[in-house]
Amino acid sequence: MRGLARDLRLTEQALNESITLQQHVDANRILQLYERLVRIFTAKGWSFERKLYASTSREGNKAMNLNSFIGLMGHSLKRVETSDGVILRDVRKDESPDFVMRDSEYVLTLDADSMLLRDYCLRLVYQMEQPGNERVAVIQTPYSSYRGAPTRIERIAAATTDIQHMLHQGMTYYDATFWVGANAVIRKAALDDICVVSTEGTRTVKTYIQDRTVIEDTESSIDLGYFGWHLVNYPERLSYSATPPDFGSLVVQRRRWANGGLLIIGKFFRIVHARHQQGNDVKLGEWALRVNYMASIAWSSFGLMFLLAYPFDQRLLSPWVVLASLPYFATMSSDLKRNGYKRSDIFRIYGFNIVLLTVNLSGTLKSIQQGMTNTKIPFARTPKVNNRTASPALYVTMPWVVIIYSCMVFYADTFSHNWGNAVFAGFNAIVTFWALTAYIGIWHSVQDMVVGLIRWFFVPIKEPQQEAVRKKASWRDALYFGDRQMIYESRPL
């Protein structure tokens, strides 16, 4: 708002100066300035709730929200009441439409907890219109975090978000960009290329963005690459998104992020093979970055668990193994400093990752379960509550397990003079205890463990289902289904 105010104040000063100097301003330019004021202070609101209509998908996820609306774009629709409910169909000749869904060359998607700067669309659509960008399907600015976070966990989670912003910028160079999902400008023609038509009962559903996983934007990025489309990260901070303020809501978000990558990586390998047969090989840089993006949570979580649990001795823990990790931590500390954080925050992020270890492992195991059972899981939205969101007992218990186990290893290795592993175990115990205190809270963790234990002992009593009362057939039932009594009488006793 302040940027817009400065812009308008500058325009006012320029107009006053032209009057003082008695200079002529073109009438068309004056008209443009008036139109700009009208557009700034005029807003039109309209909403569309897909579940009000029986002709749209019933799936409860963000992907189907987008698919339902995009599938209706460019159509003039009529509301029609049927026995299944209200449906939307295309208008027929000489009918007046109830809805006119305008078509567009571009689609802007935005999460509910995200905000865009005022020149977001202006800059990104301008880039899409430049010569040579005809095959760019998605352009985005991976969101940044809001400054001045009031809690420690929100600040560290924001630091990891800002580092991801920089990582995504580098992925564009290797044509390995992933659609992040919180915001993007998408070319409608690219969505039409990846559209899949299916049926849900009696409904015909157009799926542009696959909902097989809860990270639907990642899978759509792979689909677009197969059809020769490219994705671009615009190198500016034009979007901002809220970070979960407490550990309970962060668990929901990070567990969702950890789920789905292993399912999509198989599809990526199939597309790599298909592109090879077409003579359009995937370059090594793109291949490595995409595989790392989809599978890094899985292998880093299992690797960290192995490092915490395995009893190393002096023969395995050589100085070269320790030095191999220094470039990673040096680069991360440099990125943190560039984003306005402290270099020492790498230790806080390390503790943050240990606290979230069980969350990431559960998301990874859920992906494996989905792959084995070929099922979908519901989209879990990040809670937005005034008070603290309670955490499942498992996720607040495991940091205590890590602390106790690390202390035991430190005690045992100290007496056996295994100094390398003793130092590592002691460091893990200290960092994890600090992270538990700062990010969860000792009292809050005890509360959540007690509540989880009580819930484990008590099973909620299900209310008995009442027998369905047969209602009198309406005129719609008679027209669409005929005599229901014949059906009841023909059933065996």
Segments from the language model and where they lie:
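Loop-to-transmembrane boundary segments
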Residues: 275-298, 371, 377-408, 469-493
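C-terminal, non-catalytic tails of nucleotide-sugar-dependent glycosyltransferases
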Residues: 260-284, 359, 363, 436-440
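Membrane-embedded multi-pass helical conduit in multi-pass membrane proteins
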Residues: 289-374, 390-467
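N-terminal membrane-anchoring/stem segments of glycan-assembly enzymes
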Residues: 1-50, 71-74, 292-299, 309, ...
